[in-house]
Amino acid sequence: MTLEELITEGRNPNTMDIDRLSTVDMLKKINEEDKKVPLAVEKVIPSIAEAIDRIVPRMKKGGRLIYVGAGTSGRIGILDASECPPTFGVDPGLVVGIIAGGDSAIRNAIESAEDDVEGGRQDLVNINLTERDSVIGISASGRTPYVIGALRYAKEVGALTIGLFCNENKNVENIVDVMITPIVGPEVIMGSTRMKAGTAQKLVLNMISTGVMIKLGKVYSNLMVDLQASNEKLRERARRMVKLATGAKEDLIERVLNETNYNVKLAILMIVGDMEKEKAQKLLEMADGYIAEAIKLKDLVLQGEE
């Protein structure tokens, strides 16, 4: 596939005059194009759902979720991965972002790194990729050599391979298990895929990581009950979440949170289930961390004791 054949490299007929518009009209043009992104993502929801449903069983067996990309695509992967530990309380090694050119490429563009096919492979070798892992190759064009090299190696290892591209690429179907292709069309500025393509990638990765974490029991209702309350803002959020989940009084919430070292999930179960810390911990372990399941188990245990 040549550069001219890529949709993301096309010239946008709607923005040909953007250099002659007023600031407000220029921004309206950009905004009009941006509105197309969530609609493009909506069309690929079935593929996103398939990816989530195939990632979760692997993670339950000890697998990791790994994002691989170059340039903007790599940075977006790192951004999403880096937010998982504080948001969902997971180990920093569970969701990993890898960028062509290494960490220095996060701040400074290393454009030549994307052409390194072997680099994509080697970076996955360096993190000891296994068949339990899931690898998402992120590329606006769908043909970035670094990303293709990584996906090819992941396929060889037996890992789940997912392609997140903004162009169709039938040439990689043999190395990609799940293809996610939000087609956002030509960019406002020709070839500037940090714009619509990057936004689409961000939306999709948000959906994948959030969906996976929900299915791993990291969310109760719509509360991030495994957050790490590492500063005052997050401690305040923790108190509010326990309040919303339990309706308990402030003094009880404060006491239980202090007793659990601000473990929101444990605090909610202790209050809702009216139980001691040790029993709540045991039920959570039995329920694989799912609060709703732990509450059901408590009721079953009580029925068995009657």
Curated annotation (Swiss-Prot):
Example of a GO biological process term: N-acetylmuramic acid catabolic process
Pathway the protein contributes to: Amino-sugar metabolism; N-acetylmuramate degradation
Active site: E83, E114
Enzyme Commission identifier(s): 4.2.1.126
Catalytic EC class: lyase
GO molecular function, one term: carbohydrate derivative binding
Xref: InterPro entries: Etherase_MurQ (IPR005488), Glucokinase_regulatory_CS (IPR005486), MURQ/GCKR (IPR040190), SIS_dom (IPR001347), SIS_dom_sf (IPR046348)
Keywords: Carbohydrate metabolism, Lyase
PANTHER family attached to this UniProt entry: GLUCOKINASE REGULATORY PROTEIN (PTHR10088:SF4)
Name of protein: N-acetylmuramic acid 6-phosphate etherase
Species this protein is from: Caldanaerobacter subterraneus subsp. tengcongensis (strain DSM 15242 / JCM 11007 / NBRC 100824 / MB4)
Gene symbol of the encoding locus: murQ
